[in-house]
Amino acid sequence: MIYVMSDIHGDFQSFYKMLVKINFSSYDELFILGDIVDKGKENLCLLDFIWKNENIYLIKGNHEYLFERYLQGIVTAEIWDACGGTATRWEVDRLSVDKKADILMFLKGLPIYRNITIKDKSYFLTHSGYHADFEIIDPKTGLVDIQKSVDGAVAWDQEQYLFSNDIHYIPQKIKFDKRIIVGHYATLFLAEYRQANIYYGERYIDIDTGNKRRNRGGRLACLRLNDGREYYV
């Protein structure tokens, strides 16, 4: 079975409970659409668990990007802390130079997206989804080529893409060539939705149901793509 999750944010306990709930095994695959770190207290044990399991695939989110830039000396402690990175930074600052270098290599190698096909359905898995300034339309179909559009956005400014919320505000006339699955923006805050449930839009699915917004009713979601079954912890 193939599963997707997103925005776990250092909550290893809820993540592990989810794996138990879905009976995750070595025969399954799990794609995590970014933001495994920050805002929670179990950031590095979550990262290590994902790193060591070959059937769990992490896609880069804006918080992995901040982590990477901090290790490179580009993002300051103050900036990272302001974005929720304090607990992660405290863990990281105690690591050896070699361990930091290993983590940096891992973060730099994370993909921005993955394409998968299940039962003749094509899905484009990514963290934020879309940047309105980069829209490449296939002249034959009139559809936005999402992979080429994201490639262009990332080549121009990876940070702007990973932090973008544009997919939630696009005009109705815009159609994509693949079904997009995203995290990044909690469904609790989607206009005219505001629920801690997976959101199914006409053009995209949002699986960030606000795990680090539990004071607002948020929770961790997991979607099984083979049959559309939803799980929550």
Predicted region positions:
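N-terminal active-site segment of His-dependent metallophosphoesterases
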Residues: 1-49, 53
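Active-site-proximal beta-strand elements of phosphoester/diester hydrolases
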Residues: 1-9, 123-129, 205-207
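Divalent metal-coordination and catalytic microenvironments
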Residues: 7, 35, 50, 61-62, ...
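Active-site environment of divalent metal-dependent phosphoester hydrolases
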Residues: 9-13, 38-41, 65-68, 132, ...
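Short, conserved active-site loop motifs that form the nucleotide-linked donor/cofactor pocket
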Residues: 28, 55-56, 123, 204
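Active-site neighborhood of divalent metal-dependent phosphoester bond hydrolases
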Residues: 43-116, 120-121, 141, 145-146, ...
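His/acidic metal-ligating clusters that form di-metal
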Residues: 99-126, 131, 135-189
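Conserved beta-sheet core of the metallophosphoesterase superfamily
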Residues: 162, 166-232
